[in-house]
């Protein structure tokens, strides 16, 4: 099953996350199908903090992909 989740990048004490569509059997930071955006929790500017390709996420969800809890919360905040 395809799941849309966060993949951690960045370095120690400076996290940066990519929002990716991947197979749920793959590791968190492993191979993914498509990059759908990013989340930078440290950034102060809103434009550099989060970016989500909502059209692509909607496409994956129509194909049966599930959202992780964290991505679901980020998507809700991004739409506001």
Swiss-Prot record:
InterPro entries the UniProt entry points to: Ribosomal_bS16, Ribosomal_bS16_dom_sf
Superkingdom in the source lineage: Bacteria
GO terms, biological process: translation
SUPFAM superfamilies on file: Ribosomal protein S16
HAMAP family cross-referenced by the UniProt entry: Ribosomal_bS16
Record-stated family: Belongs to the bacterial ribosomal protein bS16 family.
Protein name, as recorded: Small ribosomal subunit protein bS16
Organism, as annotated: Wigglesworthia glossinidia brevipalpis
């Amino acid at each position: 099953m395809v799941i849309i989740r966060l993949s951690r990048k960045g370095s120690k004490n400076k996290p940066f996350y990519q929002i990716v569509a991947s197979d749920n059997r793959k590791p968190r930071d492993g191979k993914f199908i498509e990059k759908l955006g990013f989340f930078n929790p440290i950034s102060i500017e809103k434009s550099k903090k989060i970016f989500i390709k909502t059209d692509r996420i909607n496409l994956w969800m129509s194909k049966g992909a599930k959202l992780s809890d964290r991505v679901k919360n980020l998507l809700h905040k991004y739409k506001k």
